[in-house]
Amino acid sequence: ANGSKADGLKTVYPSKTFPNHISIVTGNYPSNHGIISNYFYDPDTTKFGKRPFYIGAGSTAAQDGRWINAEPVWVTVEKQSKRAMIMFWPMSDAEIMGIRPSEYYVYNEESNNKERMDQILSWLDYNGNARPSFLASYFSSVDHNGHDHGPNATQTIEAIAEADQAIGHLIDGLEARNILDEVNIIIVSDHGMTETPSSKYINIAEYLNLDDVVIVGRGPFMEIRPKNDNVDEIYQSLIGIEHTQVFKKGETPKDFHYGDNNRIEPILLLADEHWSLVTPGYSSSFGSHGYDPNYRSMNGIFVAHGPVFKSGFSGPEIRNVHLYEMMCSIMNVIPANNDGSL
């Protein structure tokens, strides 16, 4: 009630975890920052080998800053003689452009939300020049429960309540230190979530010989690389599948801002909301995201509180690529080139 909120935080395409986390902190669309999905290949095998970029426990790719082609806000801050400290923001444990946050933790799923907030509070206890200008953290439990049980399931609602309690714990800690009115807090989510009932699936093997293609991704979308360069032929065989849209690279909707990066495969098959694209043996989850960002269900949230934010203000939907410029402005640092604006 005493902060600001937006009617929604519009995600970038694809509405997946890593592309959106990196868009939030760089102000760039995925085709410019390079993290085009949670799982993808780079054709430059001399630089990256033949292994894909992927996320999850033990991913070495997600700790390799060479995959990112844009400057995250913590690098901007550190370059301008301020300090950034981060508790589990995707790729904050990678060296990017030769720079790391002053302090950071490698992602550990076992760390609960309260522990994550306690670490943020302890960093705020630093004095003078040691004190950070930028802090960030990430709660993963809402996403996990949304996938496993569906966005409206009891378990997911409980996970949201737990995240809310952890934020309450942060607020209490700031109040106890008498700094609540000095700190600007921005609470966002990287994407939304929609129900994906097990009855709504499209088995792509009914339309393609899977031996002829490399398929990257399952669920809301698939990127497809024909092994024999017969893009037109494969594309034609995918036209008109019910509950899908198919695009050649570079022909995706303009507001996706998706298509120029060499990591994007030649064909994109995109499912309608609630539908899942599968191959034999792939089981879909009860909730998913990655669909067209124009579906309201893919929206994230934006809530903010602090000296720069109006009290009791409710504004229209904003795009997450604008947050980087906003954060730079708050901290009085000069932003790197980006796709957003204030």
Tell me the role of every PLM-derived stretch.
Residues 1, 162-204:
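Metal-dependent active-site segment of extracytoplasmic phospho-/sulfohydrolases and closely related
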Residues 1-33:
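Short, structured active-site-proximal loop/turn typified by the sulfatase FGly-forming signature C/S-X-P-X-R
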Residues 6-9, 23-25, 73-76, 83-88, ...:
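Structural recognition of the beta-strand scaffold that forms the well-ordered cores
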Residues 28-150:
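His/Asp/Glu-rich, glycine-adjacent segments
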Residues 2-6, 32, 79-85, 129-135, ...:
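Loop/turn elements at helix/coil->beta-strand transitions in domains of secreted/extracellular proteins
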Residues 6-13, 87-89, 255, 314, ...:
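Surface-exposed patches in mature extracellular/periplasmic domains of secreted proteins
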Residues 216-326:
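Active-site neighborhoods of enzymes that stabilize oxyanions during catalysis
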Residues 8-11, 58-64, 74, 106-108, ...:
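Second-shell loop/turn segments in exported
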